[in-house]
C-alpha cells in the first residue's frame, strides 16, 4: 500500500512538472467579444468594466497622469435581465515617480472631493487592466480634434 501511495505521489509530481498550469490571472479579461469592455475589478459573480472607447487622459503632469473612462457594473450570469449597467465615471491616477496607482469615481462626488483609493495588491485585476486602459486613453486623447 505504501509503494502505491509513493508511486501515486511521484506520478502527480511528475505530471505537474510536465504540464504546468498557465497563469490565467495575468491575462486581461473582457466582457464582450469585441474587447471594448475591459474588466478592471472582478469578483466571482460580478465585476466592473470600463468602456475603452471612452477612456481619455484628463490630466498629465510631471508627477502623475489621470485617466477617466465610463464604468459599468457587469454580472457574469448570462440569464440576468441586465448583464451590464452603467455606473458612473471612474478615474485612475498613476504616480510617475513611484508607479503607485489610485482609483476613484464620480460616485458621491469622490473625484471632486479628491478622495483616492490606493491600489496596494499587485495581483488585482486592475494591475493587469491598467496598462491597456492607459494605452487606449492616450490613443483616444490624441484622436480628439482640437477646438478652434
Model-derived segments and their meaning:
Residues 14-23:
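C-terminal segment of classical bacterial N-terminal signal peptides
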Residues 1-10:
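Bacterial N-terminal signal peptides that target proteins for export
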Amino acid at each position: 500500500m505504501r509503494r502505491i501511495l509513493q508511486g501515486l505521489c511521484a506520478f502527480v509530481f511528475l505530471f505537474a512538472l510536465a504540464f504546468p498550469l498557465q497563469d490565467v490571472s495575468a491575462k486581461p479579461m473582457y466582457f464582450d467579444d469585441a474587447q471594448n469592455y475591459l474588466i478592471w475589478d472582478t469578483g466571482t459573480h460580478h465585476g466592473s468594466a470600463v468602456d475603452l472607447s471612452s477612456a481619455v487622459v484628463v490630466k498629465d503632469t510631471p508627477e502623475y497622469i489621470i485617466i477617466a473612462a465610463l464604468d459599468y457594473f457587469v454580472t457574469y450570469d448570462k440569464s440576468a435581465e441586465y448583464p451590464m449597467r452603467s455606473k458612473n465615471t471612474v478615474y485612475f491616477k498613476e504616480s510617475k515617480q513611484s508607479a503607485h496607482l489610485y482609483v476613484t469615481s464620480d460616485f458621491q462626488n469622490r473625484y471632486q472631493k479628491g478622495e483616492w483609493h490606493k491600489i496596494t495588491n499587485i495581483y488585482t485585476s486592475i494591475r493587469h487592466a491598467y496598462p491597456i486602459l492607459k494605452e487606449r486613453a492616450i490613443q483616444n486623447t490624441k484622436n480628439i480634434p482640437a477646438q478652434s
